[in-house]
């Protein structure tokens, strides 16, 4: 009986123990499931955004799809500015600083040498950005060097594709074309003025990668917007001629600088625009800042004798003078100021006034016409008004806003003092004269159709003055050295004193020659400006006229323009022997 009771008790105790263990295990499982459920709820609901963000940070990548900057080309399609693919050498400091014995590693030494960055300086830069995952070590590295660096397989060093501008014509078109900064943004010249047109919009795509860098999902794509190429009106063959001859002229005359502009009369297109001294836009680290400026649109000067044809055209139109009129050109006084010429002439014809560049003669003609008519003629030719060529930095010039004009004001205005123009405005003036009085907008962009214009003066009067201007490059004229063998050229030379920083005239000069060729059927207008010639001669007829002749001779030959005056060849040969 006792054994039965004992067995029953032990059996009951065993069952209770098993039940207790069962319930304990059950409770543990239930508690675990409860905790897991809470954790799932926490992860899926409460902390889901953080987890998604963390996962995306590890797997999502946004890749830029570069849009190559548009090319700048000349009218024939020759490249003036192109984009070449290069690489940026980048570093991830967070990875590099985990690497041991970096400074003693030969591959790091090789990187230092190929980038010309001292190893100590490189690691000072890396250490100063310890928490960064991206810094630049070098930019715009050519593909050969980039490939070498890639083969070094340095931890934390990687390549980033980027672009660089290259300018094939270097100094020849530097001030006009300009350049971009290291990020491809135009900061000078055409590059700056047409930056929006040349710049496309980069695209981007969002992808998901696995831990080995393989693309496992393409999430989104924003297509890049293509950039535009730009075809300028410039002809690089003519631009090269103009630049080389201008450079030589600046050197011979010992001028501070020189500017030359060539215009296609029929279309108003700028075929060449050159400055000297220049710079190499492919190496902007070593440029002289004053040489960057495009003086054709930024610099102002008093046009001097180059405006005298305007006065003659207006006087002929008003009937104040006739083609065969004779003018008394003896010196005279206005308000205690003497008006005189460089060389004395008692009387001159209208042609003689232009040929000898008589200040006295043109002053007397200007004084005989209504003031408003004189001013209006200058305004019609665009003096003191921007050309609206589209180039950033173009100056307006200066036309005096006087309500009352004294006789002295009128006299000095007639020979180009008291107003300021840019070289481009002067080029437009002579382009208008060459078009027989048609005021046509200039263009730096290639045009496929003839540009319309406005007839601002009757052609018959303008043609008469062009014929008179031919005498300037003939024996007895101040611009004899501007003559071109075999061609009739209509020119006007000039010399003006420069204004100093205190607003007074100083003993420095601007010499210029502006002209048209061939005079029988004008095709081109050309202006040459030399700033502060410091040689023995400084007059326009002596320093800028030869540059005009050299350039125009080569231009007419290059463009296969038929000679229209074979009779002047002997005259030029004799003149050259005398000089």
From Swiss-Prot:
Catalyzes cross-linking of the peptidoglycan cell wall at the division septum. It is a single-pass membrane protein. It comes from Buchnera aphidicola subsp. Acyrthosiphon pisum (strain APS). The keyword Cell wall biogenesis/degradation applies. The active site is at 305 (acyl-ester intermediate). It catalyses: Preferential cleavage: (Ac)2-L-Lys-D-Ala-|-D-Ala. Also transpeptidation of peptidyl-alanyl moieties that are N-acyl substituents of D-alanine. This is Peptidoglycan D,D-transpeptidase FtsI. Belongs to the transpeptidase family. FtsI subfamily.
């Amino acid at each position: 009986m006792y054994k039965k009771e004992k067995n029953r008790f032990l059996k009951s105790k065993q069952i209770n123990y098993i039940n207790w263990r069962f319930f304990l295990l059950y409770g543990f499982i239930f508690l675990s499931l409860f905790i897991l459920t809470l954790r799932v709820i926490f992860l899926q609901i409460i902390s889901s955004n953080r987890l998604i963000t963390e996962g995306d940070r590890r797997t999502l990548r946004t890749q830029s799809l570069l849009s190559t900057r548009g090319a700048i080309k000349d009218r024939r399609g020759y490249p003036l500015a192109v984009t070449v693919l290069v690489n940026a050498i980048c570093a991830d400091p967070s990875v590099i600083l985990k690497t041991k014995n970096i400074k003693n590693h030969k591959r790091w030494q090789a990187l230092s040498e190929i980038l010309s960055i001292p190893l100590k300086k490189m690691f000072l830069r890396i250490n100063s950005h310890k928490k960064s995952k991206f810094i630049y070590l070098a930019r715009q590295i050519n593909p050969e060097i980039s490939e070498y660096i890639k083969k070094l397989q340095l931890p934390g060093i990687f390549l980033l594709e980027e672009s660089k501008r290259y300018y094939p014509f270097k100094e020849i078109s530097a001030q006009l074309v300009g350049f971009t900064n290291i990020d491809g943004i135009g900061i000078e010249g055409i590059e700056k003025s047409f930056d929006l047109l040349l710049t496309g919009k980069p695209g981007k795509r969002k992808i998901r990668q696995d831990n080995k860098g393989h693309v496992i999902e393409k999430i989104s794509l924003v297509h890049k917007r293509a950039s535009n190429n730009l075809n300028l009106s410039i002809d690089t063959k003519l631009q090269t001629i103009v630049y080389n001859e201008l450079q030589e002229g600046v050197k011979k005359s010992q001028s501070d600088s020189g500017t030359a502009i060539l215009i296609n009369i029929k279309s108003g297109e700028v075929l060449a625009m050159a400055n000297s001294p220049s710079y190499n836009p492919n190496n902007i680290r070593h440029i002289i800042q004053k040489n960057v400026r495009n003086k054709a649109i930024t610099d102002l000067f008093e046009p001097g004798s180059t405006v005298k044809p305007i006065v003659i055209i207006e006087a002929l139109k008003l009937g104040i003078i006739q083609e065969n009129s004779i003018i008394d050109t003896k010196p005279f006084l206005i308000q205690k100021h003497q008006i005189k010429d460089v060389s004395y002439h008692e009387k001159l014809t209208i042609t003689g006034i232009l040929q000898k560049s008589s200040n006295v003669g043109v002053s007397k003609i200007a004084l005989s016409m209504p003031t408003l008519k004189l001013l209006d003629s200058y305004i019609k030719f665009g003096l003191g008004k921007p050309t609206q060529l589209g180039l950033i930095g173009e100056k307006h010039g200066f036309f005096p806003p006087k309500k009352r004009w004294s006789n002295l004001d009128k006299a000095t205005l007639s020979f180009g003092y008291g107003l300021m123009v840019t070289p481009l405005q002067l080029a437009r003036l002579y382009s208008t004269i060459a078009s027989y009085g048609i005021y046509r907008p200039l263009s730096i962009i290639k045009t496929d159709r003839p540009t319309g214009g406005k007839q601002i003066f009757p052609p018959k009067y303008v043609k008469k003055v062009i014929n008179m201007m031919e005498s300037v490059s003939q024996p007895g004229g101040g611009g004899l050295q501007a003559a071109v063998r075999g061609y009739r050229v209509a020119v006007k030379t000039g010399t003006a004193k420069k204004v100093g920083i205190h607003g007074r005239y100083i003993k420095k000069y601007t010499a210029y020659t502006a002209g048209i060729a061939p005079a029988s059927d004008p095709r081109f207008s050309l202006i040459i400006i030399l700033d502060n010639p410091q040689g023995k001669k400084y007059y326009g007829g002596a320093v800028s006229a030869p540059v005009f002749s050299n350039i125009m001779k080569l231009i007419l030959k290059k463009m296969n323009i038929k000679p229209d005056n074979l009779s002047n060849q002997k005259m030029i040969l004799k003149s050259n022997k005398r000089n």
